[in-house]
Amino acid sequence: MKILFVAAEGAPFSKTGGLGDVIGALPKSLVKAGHEVAVILPYYDMVEAKFGSQIEDVLHFEVSVGWRRQYCGIKKTVLNGVTFYFIDNQYYFFRGHVYGDFDDGERFAFFQLAAIEAMERIDFIPDLLHVHDYHTAMIPFLLKEKYRWIQAYEDIETVLTIHNLEFQGQFSEGMLGDLFGVGFERYADGTLRWNNCLNWMKAGILYANRVSTVSPSYAHEIMTSQFGCNLDQILKMESGKVSGIVNGIDADLYNPQTDALLDYHFNQEDLSGKAKNKAKLQERVGLPVRADVPLVGIVSRLTRQKGFDVVVESLHHILQEDVQIVLLGTGDPAFEGAFSWFAQIYPDKLSTNITFDVKLAQEIYAACDLFLMPSRFEPCGLSQMMAMRYGTLPLVHEVGGLRDTVRAFNPIEGSGTGFSFDNLSPYWLNWTFQTALDLYRNHPDIWRNLQKQAMESDFSWDTACKSYLDLYHSLVN
């Protein structure tokens, strides 16, 4: 099968979040499964700086962006068997960052038009075209409405993956003519209109052959008013083509037996290396080196979406316990300030690190006993899976991908891979935290069994790849 991905970012070339991880990993797994895979990305200035010497020029042409004629260069490289093509236009993509400009609508309108017109020129007409989030969600619409006259495109099946429904691409309806060069018929009849705006995500949901999300629970949640971001009724209407597939993680990169960022390696049969990493981490972040105290890790953006308003409200109560917490992250200045203040009040119990540090993050995943992740909503989440790979048990709010990946501790069977609570409130966070502390202190054999189950969980991309292939094969025979 010929599969083409079109996305706004993709590791290792450009990455701001989970979308970049998916584009870096899923195509590689599909190639291993025997498929022909290509990816189209914007050619950002950071790509030029880091990978420019490895990328070759292929061709160039002009793209009509409404009344504008814009230069479009095509560049190419091959990595892990995947052919990466880049859309080059320095005016649109040499901005020093991926998102956040006033003209993002024009930038990604150009990118989508260029990607569609590039397919013929690079001689890669896919059986399956997989687009991601609002930045490329207009492509299924454009294929069926603007480019339907191109015979080579007639049999292309499309999949839209929603990584985060909050970001929908809502713009003035004038963009249809001014940038995309199409009529207003589909806006006038309501197909593309939402809240009196052109909504790219709605267009993708209605025009793609299939819609996927990054976990089964999130697929269900976005059809409710609580998580649907005002598109829940549209998603309910299209529910027959909506499904969820949990993202994977790189099982080779996040491997406690080989991780190059760790001082000591270990496995589920021998956790002595984990204990040594714990002592090393305590020393590094300025906490008393104690093997007996439960060490809790947090690696996150410090935002309300991640549940840190509830954590801050609970923190004084939590820190009355004989416990240590190490936090790594940046975000809302109010939360940064709160954690910094608590670290001054409880210097032997809380280490607050307001920064971004890849090595420290990896050490937290590997060395801690518990990993706190009480997100208000979480489409998939990767940190809880990384923590489990290292035998660090997640304590999570049962939502989205957290619900799908963390098996809550069952005291009757003594089974599970972590701890969870359903109602996001200080009371239930504290109650679940106490349950975990009691198990850690009084039932070490059960705790050890949970660690083993967590480390044996399969979150590899090869497993996720099989689910995506089932989805693709439902469209392409």
UniProtKB/Swiss-Prot annotation:
The keyword Transferase applies. One of its GO terms (biological process) is glycogen biosynthetic process. It catalyses: [(1->4)-alpha-D-glucosyl](n) + ADP-alpha-D-glucose = [(1->4)-alpha-D-glucosyl](n+1) + ADP + H(+). One of its GO terms (molecular function) is alpha-1,4-glucan glucosyltransferase (UDP-glucose donor) activity. Pathway: Glycan biosynthesis; glycogen biosynthesis. The keyword Membrane does not apply. Signal peptide: none annotated. CDD domains: GT5_Glycogen_synthase_DULL1-like. Its EC number is 2.4.1.21. NCBIfam families: glgA, PRK00654.1-1. Synthesizes alpha-1,4-glucan chains using ADP-glucose. Belongs to the glycosyltransferase 1 family. Bacterial/plant glycogen synthase subfamily. This is Glycogen synthase. It comes from Streptococcus pneumoniae (strain 70585).
